[in-house]
């Protein structure tokens, strides 16, 4: 696959990948950026508009995987996967989320980036697209000054799960990508981290 940053030029490909439902239930990858009240009032077109505005600012918000490694115009190429990744402070929900709670409450989180979400087109699932996106995300964050990348994956313990259970990624995928298990968060979730050069 070819990986590209989400920006104004690749926005049309993201819209086609997410479809009219905004990936899942009108989320448009805004869940981690909003309070519950903001999210509920924005489901659908409002979330889409807000996410589109973010993409057009050039702020780091994530990467797309395309089904070709050619130099096809990004407005015509078909995206097959997405990973949301940004500085941890950009995700207001993480301040309150048990799964993302730092081990040390006094830790300086400057330079920590968070991988919050994956979305892979149903026709591309099972082909390693999410793992390729995760590898690219670590490099991309490092190039932008991250010192640590963290995630909040699901521990499937070898069991099959539905795609709606896996949007955080799997623990195995993160560990295979060089992340360390920092802490278990309940029976199915984990906090993982990888220090980047």
Task: Give residue spans per PLM region.
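A short helix-loop-beta-strand connector motif used in the catalytic cores of GNAT acetyltransferases and
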Residues: 25, 37-64, 88-94, 114
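Conserved hydrophobic beta-strand within the GNAT/NAT acetyltransferase core sheet
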Residues: 115, 149-151
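Conserved acetyl-CoA-binding loop-helix of GNAT-fold acetyltransferases
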Residues: 115-120, 126-143
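Conserved N-terminal entry element of GNAT/NAT acetyltransferase domains
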Residues: 1-33
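Conserved acyl-donor/pantetheine-binding loop and adjacent beta-alpha core of acyl/acetyltransferases
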Residues: 53-57, 76-121, 125, 161-168, ...
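Conserved active-site alpha-helix within GNAT-family acetyltransferase domains
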Residues: 142-147, 155-184
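Conserved beta-hairpin
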Residues: 14, 60-83
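Charge-dense, helix-prone N-terminal extensions
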Residues: 1, 12-16, 35-46, 53-54, ...
